[in-house]
Curated annotation (Swiss-Prot):
<comment type="similarity">
    <text>Belongs to the bacterial ribosomal protein bL33 family.</text>
</comment>
<protein>
    <recommendedName>
        <fullName>Large ribosomal subunit protein bL33</fullName>
    </recommendedName>
</protein>
<dbReference type="GO" id="GO:0003735">
    <property type="term" value="F:structural constituent of ribosome"/>
</dbReference>
<dbReference type="InterPro" id="IPR011332">
    <property type="entry name" value="Ribosomal_zn-bd"/>
</dbReference>
<dbReference type="GO" id="GO:0006412">
    <property type="term" value="P:translation"/>
</dbReference>
<dbReference type="InterPro" id="IPR001705">
    <property type="entry name" value="Ribosomal_bL33"/>
</dbReference>
<dbReference type="InterPro" id="IPR018264">
    <property type="entry name" value="Ribosomal_bL33_CS"/>
</dbReference>
<keyword id="KW-0687">Ribonucleoprotein</keyword>
<dbReference type="Pfam" id="PF00471">
    <property type="entry name" value="Ribosomal_L33"/>
</dbReference>
<dbReference type="GO" id="GO:0022625">
    <property type="term" value="C:cytosolic large ribosomal subunit"/>
</dbReference>
<keyword id="KW-0689">Ribosomal protein</keyword>
<dbReference type="InterPro" id="IPR038584">
    <property type="entry name" value="Ribosomal_bL33_sf"/>
</dbReference>
<feature type="region of interest" description="Disordered">
    <location>
        <begin position="1"/>
        <end position="20"/>
    </location>
</feature>
Length: 51
């Protein structure tokens, strides 16, 4: 089952992306480097819950 997740910026800007992931094949927390338009740099985004 694919669950929706929120990718929060580690730069502390409050910017986020939403995506989904398969929890059976990826049980660990998701981390990826993406572009943060607020600071205009590539930063790490970490998985968080959608409220």
């Amino acid at each position: 089952m694919r669950d929706k997740i929120r990718l929060n910026s580690s730069a502390g800007t409050g910017h986020f992306y939403t995506t989904d992931k398969n929890k059976k094949t990826m049980p660990e927390k998701f981390e990826i480097k993406k572009f943060d338009p607020v600071v205009r740099k590539h930063v790490m985004y970490k998985e968080g819950k959608i409220k």
